[in-house]
Amino acid sequence: EIIEEECKINKIKFSKKEFEEYLKKHQELSKTASAGRFKSGLADNSEATTKLHTATHLLNEALRIILSKDIKQKGSNITPERLRFDFSFDRKLTSEEIKKIVDLVNKKIQESLDVVREEMSLKKAFESGAQGEFGAKYPEKVSVYTIKNFSKEICTGPHVKNTKELGKFKIIKEESSSNGVRRIKAILEN
């Protein structure tokens, strides 16, 4: 009704039937595009995907510690089989760097660190040192997941309660995603 009124005021041709058909097509397209995809880049909400999601947070911080504090997440995709993590970095990782990253992630898994969720304002989250995905749009109130004394990120979850639930972390591939962006694919083994 509001749209019809605005169209009349602005002398714009409006067909309610065409509008409803367009809206229905758009909704179907949106459903298709987002099928099996949550906002957090997760393919589903399974235990395996949840574990890999938590491992992604460990990986992100390990990259920042081993390579550079300037590293920013550029995207992720997590399925029950593997995680894919894109990050800002301008060169191929050496085998020594990959080993250090894997070792650090596995060390944090073995330390049995608690994963704690807090809700806070976006401003407070950034002031507290929480990392966020570059270019992401966040609501005013956000969830922040902290992996005890290691990682702190704005995230919608879900996560395990403790890193000991994860198993052994292993990078299976490191490659270029695009100019200035690297991609890591990794798995968790029992």
What do these predicted regions represent?
Residues 1-190:
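A glycine- and charged-residue-rich anion-binding loop/surface
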